[in-house]
Amino acid sequence: MISAKEIRSKIASVKSTQKITKAMEMVAASKMRKSQESMSATRPYAEMIRKVIGHLALGNLEYKHPYLQERKVKRVGYLVVSTDRGLCGGLNVNLFKKILTDMHDQSEKNVASELSLIGSKGVAFFNSIGAKIVAQVTGISDKPSLPDIIGPVQAMLKAYDEGRLDKLYIANNRFINTMSQQPQITQLLPLLPMDEGQIGVTKKSWDYLYEPEPKVLLDTLLRRYIESQVYQGVVENISSEQAARMVAMKAATDNGGNLIDELQLIYNKARQASITQELTEIVGGASAL
């Protein structure tokens, strides 16, 4: 039977771990709030660019940008946003499963796939299964900047510009609330058309003069829009990561408390048995005298 000393040692060890998980829970909660603020701050920028692109696209321009035109799909690209650290439940696993399912569906249509990865967990996983990886970046901070993630984005845009990709998707975790994060795959290119209602104008209301010329403007805005969408996806994935970690650490802290209660009960029983044994020995010794 385990001794009282060993039980006390286990209780102390669990309490020490519990302090760590509680601290990690609080840190994750703080980081989640900050990343949500970043997410809210960057969303209007992307929405406004999208509306301007929609205005230009509805203008019946002779120039049709390649990013707005459908192609026959032979190869697709995925910009995969994963985490650099673990301890966030099934966040990465669920995302990878969704990507593999989508890649399998593409393969059934004789469409090849290639990946550009943001986050060390994605790099480790897709390297382990031998997927085609064209670019990768790891070590993204909790407050990312566009230069931190631009490498994989530029690699995919270059492939699309050169005709080596016919569709481009971003795969990341969507932040729904603290308790719920959902893996999602969103089409980036070609850009899905917006109707007049989404833009907020009708063709009759056109009275805009653009400078520089629409072609130059589209070239710049479309690339900026894709970059902003990827950045938004990275920030949202960080929010999802911190929320999942906060929930996981809270569960670990609660489980630690339950384990301490169980160990304390075992310790009390062992202590009681020890006292009973000592009393029995004392009574037995007295009777012998």
From Swiss-Prot:
CDD domains: F1-ATPase_gamma (cd12151). GO terms for molecular function: ATP binding; proton-transporting ATP synthase activity, rotational mechanism. It is found in: Cell membrane. The gene is atpG. Belongs to the ATPase gamma chain family. This is ATP synthase gamma chain. One of its GO terms (cellular component) is plasma membrane. One of its GO terms (biological process) is proton motive force-driven plasma membrane ATP synthesis. F-type ATPases have 2 components, CF(1) - the catalytic core - and CF(0) - the membrane proton channel. CF(1) has five subunits: alpha(3), beta(3), gamma(1), delta(1), epsilon(1). CF(0) has three main subunits: a, b and c. It comes from Hamiltonella defensa subsp. Acyrthosiphon pisum (strain 5AT). It is a peripheral membrane protein. Its main location: membrane. The keyword 4Fe-4S does not apply. The keyword Ion transport applies.
